């Protein structure tokens, strides 16, 4: 059993099933505008920053103005679909509550902006368990850079190496690993690459498995 001093969770795709909603909104937005986005590109969007995703689509489509309209349309669809269809990932509430109740400080490190992230955490009853939260609009470099995890550790007052991180995406796992954290991956859309699979301490089927690995 591992004994971290704190646990840092990603949000999108890890605690809440935003990746399913995001992929559906991308497919619908692209279809509305007559654009075909390959499944491989949609999978690459998992854990990807908006600027990086935009660059990928511009390289595919070649029309910057069309891409700007696509991203605007997708953002509107995503917010509507998120409010209607979003669910927690299996075991998310139970895992976060169990770690908190065992006395482990729990933090959130999400690329989503605070104004969008915190209402979701309140909605699902998770906000009450976090000792600190770091959001995408509060850091300079997005995942796979380690900034957000380093900042979470700083706010927790804990060395990054003494923290466990929980992620669903390859880019997110790379960020946590680069920060020096013991990293678990709970993949849904994006299978871990061989190097990430080797570097992570565990690849979990669901968050139901996590408490036993950290608190027994």
What kind of feature is each model-predicted range?
Residues 1-5, 97-100, 113-216:
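Asp-based, Mg2+/Mn2+-dependent phosphohydrolase catalytic module
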Residues 36, 41, 58-97:
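Metal-dependent phosphoesterase signature
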Residues 1-43:
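Active-site neighborhood of HAD-like aspartate-dependent phosphohydrolases
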Residues 29-30, 49-63, 120, 152-153:
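Helix-loop "lid/cap" segments that line or gate small-molecule binding pockets
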Residues 3, 80-108, 114-118:
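Short, acidic loop-to-helix structural element flanking the phosphoryl-transfer center
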């Amino acid at each position: 059993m591992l004994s971290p001093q704190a646990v840092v969770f990603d949000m999108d795709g890890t605690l809440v099933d935003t990746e399913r909603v995001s992929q559906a909104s991308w497919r619908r937005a692209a279809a509305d505008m007559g654009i075909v986005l390959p499944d491989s590109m949609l999978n690459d969007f998992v854990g990807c920053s908006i600027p990086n995703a935009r660059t990928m689509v511009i390289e595919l489509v070649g029309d910057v103005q069309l891409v700007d309209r696509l991203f605007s349309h997708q953002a509107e669809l995503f917010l509507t679909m998120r409010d209607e269809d979003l669910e927690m990932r299996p075991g998310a509430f139970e895992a976060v509550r169990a770690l908190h109740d065992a006395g482990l400080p729990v933090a959130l490190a999400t690329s989503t902006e605070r104004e969008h992230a915190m209402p979701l955490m309140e909605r699902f009853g998770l906000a009450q368990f976090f000792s600190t939260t770091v959001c995408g609009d509060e850091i300079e470099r997005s995942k796979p850079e380690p900034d957000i995890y380093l900042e979470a550790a700083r706010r927790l007052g804990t060395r990054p190496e003494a923290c466990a991180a929980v992620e669903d995406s390859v880019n997110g796992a790379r960020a946590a690993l680069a920060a020096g954290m013991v990293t678990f991956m709970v993949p849904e859309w994006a299978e871990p690459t061989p190097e990430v699979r080797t570097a992570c301490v565990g690849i979990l089927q669901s968050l139901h498995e996590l408490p036993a690995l950290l608190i027994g």
